[in-house]
């Protein structure tokens, strides 16, 4: 791949859980005109340390710049670019689907095929929860759209490397 070819990259960024860190990280992207596809921030197994999973479409040159700039942010502890073939990544999708007594069984059948689940049932709708790859979630949405999608929300990817990545055990 040429340095100017744009491709999808997933970064796992360990940061100290301090006020304003998320703003500082997103501000770095914004100031330089880099677009974030998705960003998820969550606690890790180590108290006081959060993991940011950042997905971006960028060239190798831009990714080098992103990594250098992130390393300048003091509460950033470690940055790892996750390789697609050595990573498990999933997103969460919740969909409110029009479903009455007539079509509800078909909606539930479709949900079950995708190993998703119905988390709420109302008179004229159901709320479906699904986790999976972007492809799986898009396929489920394609199946549900003919019934009528009333509301939709989807998280960004959370990801873990299948290869052990040593992590810090203390805060500086």
Model-identified regions with their sequence ranges:
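Short glycine-/aliphatic-rich beta-strand segments at the starts of folded cytosolic domains
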Residues: 7-15, 50-52, 87-98
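Helix N-cap motif at beta-to-alpha junctions
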Residues: 18, 57-62, 100-101, 132-137
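Short amphipathic alpha-helices in soluble, non-transmembrane regions
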Residues: 25-27, 65-73, 107-112, 140-145
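Short, charge-patterned binding micro-sites
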Residues: 36-59, 83-89
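Helix-adjacent hinge/juxtasegments
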Residues: 58-98
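Conserved short beta-strand edge segments in small beta-sheet-based binding/regulatory domains
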Residues: 74-86, 117-123, 148-161
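Long, charge-patterned amphipathic alpha-helical coiled-coil/hairpin "stalk" segments used as oligomerization
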Residues: 84-128, 134
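Single conserved hydrophobic/aromatic residue that forms the stacking wall/gate
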Residues: 163-172
